[in-house]
Every structure is written in structure tokens, then in C-alpha cells.
Amino acid sequence: MGRAIGAIEGLPVLDLGRRVADELGTSPDLALVAVPEADYRRVEARVACQVLDHAVAQGAVVALGSGCLGDPRIGLRLEELRLVHDRSYQIVALACATRVLATRNGLDAPRSVALGTVHHQFVQMLHERQARCQDLADVVIDTTSTTPDEAGKKVM
């Protein structure tokens, strides 16, 4: 969705997941398992602050992802940006039906006992992150049945 908004607005897109992976010397698909999670989150928080600063200085769409909001400094930074810049920045939270997100993340094997605990943990994590995202958001967009381009147009 960030790419869709960037294309509409003519702005570059700063993807936190990609930048963290680059910093760790791996691909975005493997970054979270390539290093211990605490190391990943530490790098993620530092890089999130950098991309937010870059967006303020030069203009950009920033795709943060919900994981970085586990660090309270990121939420505070987003609130500061909103206050200092008189709401010229819009914080968008993406929501999606749990079943659809499970499918998108490969947790949809039919009647798999092995995935039961993983699915339960996923749902708990999802609810915690959705609450954090929605608390910070100016707009919540449901992506359950939309493409990234359609979701981007809803924001605009």
C-alpha cells in the first residue's frame, strides 16, 4: 500500500522491513529469523527513527510495520511528528480479518494440530499490535478484501 500512495503522491517509499534487512545483511523474508529477535528489534527501532527523520526532512511515505511499535519510543516519535507538524503527516493503520492474515502468513493448513499453538500466538500478537496501531492512527483501512492499490486510494 505504501508504494501505491508513493506513486499517487510522487514520493519515495521508505520500507522499514527492507532497510532493517539491508542493515542486517539479509533479505526481508529472512531478517527476523537471521538474528535473535532482540537484536532485530534493536536495529528496527534505530532504523525506524532514521526513516522517520528522513521522511520529515525530505518527504516520503514510510511503511513501518506493526512490530516496531513494541518499542514505545516509536509511538512517542510518531506522536511528536504529529504535534510538531500540525497533522501534516497522516498515520494509517491497516486492519485485516484474522483468517485472511493467517492465510497471507502461511498459517492456514487445514486442520493442522501442529499449527494450533502457533496460530493461537499469532492471533494474540495480532490483537496486541492492532490495538497499538489503532491508538496511533489517524485512519484505519481494512485490507481484508482490497489490493494494495485499492487500499492506497482509500487513504488518498
Each model region followed by its residue ranges:
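A glycine- and Lys/Arg-enriched "phosphate-lid" helix/loop adjacent to the NTP-binding pocket
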Residues: 83-132
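NTP-dependent small-molecule kinase module
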Residues: 4, 8, 90, 130-156
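Post-Walker A helix-loop "phosphate-sensing" segment adjacent to the P-loop in P-loop NTPases
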Residues: 7-16
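ATP-dependent small-molecule kinase phosphotransfer cores
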Residues: 18-80
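Hydrophobic beta-strand scaffold residues
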Residues: 13, 60, 89-92
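A non-catalytic, amphipathic alpha-helix used as a structural packing/dimerization or gating element
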Residues: 39-46, 124, 128-135
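Short, glycine/charged-enriched secondary-structure capping and boundary segments
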Residues: 4-5, 28-30, 75-79, 106-110, ...
